[in-house]
């Protein structure tokens, strides 16, 4: 491995990211494919990945931390994960887990995807304690064999990689499984010096106001009326291709757009629908129409900064649409979607450079909130992979995945994950709400007209 400091990026230094990001792929296995051959192919792919991108076979450490300074996260060499050792872990749960066919036939409900069994690490935002005897790998891949299939969970340490980075890791494993060489461009981008990927503002350049990202002192945080986490629950819902088309058409009425908005994407329309219907059931419960409701979207800023998709570092910028609960519940879908699109349109190179400069200048980054002030009983945050063509990817002897999921981990209230679009054009959405709000959502006629319950 070259100088470990090269693996330090700017946006990945928030302590809250000391956790693991997960993407799970499911594959059917025919009887004529031996598990031994699958393990051999996966292990060869994992070794090739860690050889081509050495920091992936390293451990994540924090250096330079102390009073008033949260230090820097980087990957350093670790024999435990570096070739000839492997970042692949293998588990067989054939005897005591549902079959692959049962999971897929049920459309992949969260109840059949136990992260404590089918994943090697806990998930963001749950952190971990690392030590010499139990170091934190930059990436672990767990292959869980069950009757009729295999589940591949990619668990990437979040200070070093965002969702786009994990997707690129998956792409390179698929490339190797197809018997192809990892492209030179992918190797160069994966190993580039991260410290200067985002050009920070010069001292003389004005910085935007990012004070909303500073955490208020504990004494200033009002008591949260939300019930115990034991009452929070993850649930999957499906939006069919025809439903997505209908929502896009409804949300594309320019008469209701904010004047600055000229276009609404399908993802805008879907996120606006999620925002509006969840806000509506919460308004019925809370009876607080004037409370501001925020939807925060995690945005991949590689394109904004002209950084190739092969780059694996943290490149996420959060933007929010805001409307009072009462207005949001009664607004047209086009109005809600245009509010979200207007927020996306505010992202440009200067805004990102200003944000990165603000983060870089804070020695104690524990004082920063990931996306600003957030009331989980009102606000919500969404991360979307809808445009990622994982269902069409070729994994050599495994074929294409029949299921893409985030496994079931500790609940994170008001968090939404949008899964990649299937070959048929459907999109599945994972939502964490209180049981009461999930029940109210499933009883909402407007919701059930468009969303199919998976569980």
UniProtKB/Swiss-Prot annotation:
<comment type="function">
    <text>O-acetyltransferase; part of the gene cluster that mediates the biosynthesis of azaphilone pigments (MonAzPs), a complex mixture of compounds with a common azaphilone skeleton very widely used as food colorants. The first step of the pathway is performed by the nrPKS pigA that forms the hexaketide precursor from successive condensations of five malonyl-CoA units, with a simple acetyl-CoA starter unit.</text>
</comment>
<dbReference type="GO" id="GO:0031409">
    <property type="term" value="F:pigment binding"/>
</dbReference>
<dbReference type="InterPro" id="IPR054710">
    <property type="entry name" value="Tri101-like_N"/>
</dbReference>
<dbReference type="Pfam" id="PF22664">
    <property type="entry name" value="TRI-like_N"/>
</dbReference>
<protein>
    <recommendedName>
        <fullName>O-acyltransferase pigD</fullName>
        <ecNumber>2.3.1.-</ecNumber>
    </recommendedName>
</protein>
<comment type="similarity">
    <text>Belongs to the trichothecene 3-O-acetyltransferase family.</text>
</comment>
<keyword id="KW-0808">Transferase</keyword>
<dbReference type="InterPro" id="IPR050317">
    <property type="entry name" value="Plant_Fungal_Acyltransferase"/>
</dbReference>
<keyword id="KW-0012">Acyltransferase</keyword>
<dbReference type="InterPro" id="IPR023213">
    <property type="entry name" value="CAT-like_dom_sf"/>
</dbReference>
<keyword id="KW-0608">Pigment</keyword>
<dbReference type="GO" id="GO:0016747">
    <property type="term" value="F:acyltransferase activity, transferring groups other than amino-acyl groups"/>
</dbReference>
<comment type="pathway">
    <text>Secondary metabolite biosynthesis.</text>
</comment>
